């Protein structure tokens, strides 16, 4: 394989960046909802401007009220966010209310950055008038011309006069990014709400809605910002509970789902639940996908050819120490030609022919992969009356990533920045594999390695079933599978694709944040399909920033087409890395 350049910013990658950012935004609001912060600008408590639960569900996939201005407190964090509008959403809405005891004069201006693609956005209220003292929702029609596919920036400017004699005027700017498709005519019917589960969620009674109270200023210093996020994440995590069939909450739960019933407590004290499966997709992405290949598709002739090319003499391999041992599998540290440090995978003498064949087949999965983030096989030794050796390069004390994370002395020294760096390295490696039509099918920390410089590499899954037996389960079909890492379509129909790899990568990121805890530890493997269909997903780890959790949660969208590609994941991880290192 040749290295692939992933630095280009395609339109679909930008789609992902803004789409991922919207979920980062909403989840960070959920984490901060319990705090009554007053560090933002104020407008004398005369005004509310917010998105109602229906609008938030349509655009952001969460049942909540998101305030831009609440009782005069301006949420600059929300105002600075550009909300993407999917192609199937034909209008956007806002809700406002005057709290001054009288109508507040206003003026509205809506601007499209491309009149050819998105002409004349029309609002259903006057461009100038008075904000009523009762709650009112108004909307802006965003009907694309269908002449070409593009992303169009829509800027909504709202000017509110609080006190004309004192020249007290508030200016608010709301930004949207509308996705327009070719032949997407203005007459197309809207598909805003067509999911029964989404409909059920949107039509919750008011007592079951989450009200977000946020007044965070983006201009806060780095120390305050980091401390605030850490405090809020810890507080939210301590309150996170799982309600099963109306029973008592399980405080040790590692998963969560959307709460579709009114909570017993107020929204400020109840757990915040999330179902990524109902996130509306961005329909502007059209990345071509190659036909995937996997271990099962390797022909015997191809396997023989690869082994022939990689054959090394057994006498050149020296084993120095045993790193891992299973029922039949072994992993050693050693040297090749007395100069090159290597990892050696092999099997015991009592291993069956099938186990030997599986070692060779899975060991060849990443054959020829030339990428700094991939641990490709270096050589194979097969000699009569001996078990095979599969060699991998192992500079700088390379070891298994899951074992590294399970070692308390190592795991507690890993920072959030380093976790993001690891995830970014692996996303680039997987983007490289997918660009060559290779689907990994078993992405997890057990199938990665790490060196002393915390550089991580993706490896194949050979011997993993034997070395990490608790990570695999047999569901009555005589096949050990990584059930807790698998997407719903992989569980139900054994359908593996780039999208199922994306799902597993989300679980891998969760492992990185939890020191390789077992995902869905409380769930019986036979119940996983049921739990995923019901919307349950892994809960946010205690030490995981909201933005990072949003990236992993987006990988768990129910429909494969709604999950991000690894090029998109890399873009989002790079953006988050820039954010968290800006003040360091």
From Swiss-Prot:
Glycan-modified residues: 124, 163, 168, 183
Side Cytoplasmic, residues: 230-584
Residues covered by the WIF domain: 49-180
Domain Protein kinase: start-end pairs: 317-577
Annotated Polar residues bias: 250-261
Binding site for ATP: 323-331, 345
SUPFAM superfamilies found in the cross-reference section: Protein kinase-like (PK-like)
Gene Ontology biological-process annotations: axon guidance; axonogenesis; cell surface receptor protein tyrosine kinase signaling pathway; determination of muscle attachment site; muscle attachment; positive regulation of neuron projection development; positive regulation of phosphatidylinositol 3-kinase/protein kinase B signal transduction; salivary gland morphogenesis
Active-site residues, as the UniProt record annotates them: 442
Transmembrane segments: 209-229
Stretch forming the signal peptide: 1-40
Tissue: Expressed in dynamic domains in the embryonic epidermis, many of which border on sites of epithelial invagination into the embryo interior, including ventral furrow, cephalic furrow, fore- and hindgut, optic lobe and tracheal pits. Later in embryogenesis, expression is seen in imaginal tissues.
Membrane protein topology class: Single-pass membrane protein
Entries under InterPro entries matching the protein: Kinase-like_dom_sf, Prot_kinase_dom, RTK, Ser-Thr/Tyr_kinase_cat_dom, Tyr_kinase_AS, WIF, WIF_sf
PROSITE patterns for this protein: PROTEIN_KINASE_DOM, PROTEIN_KINASE_TYR, WIF
Entry similarity comment: Belongs to the protein kinase superfamily. Tyr protein kinase family.
Protein name listed in UniProt: Tyrosine-protein kinase Dnt
Organism: Drosophila melanogaster (Fruit fly)
Gene: dnt
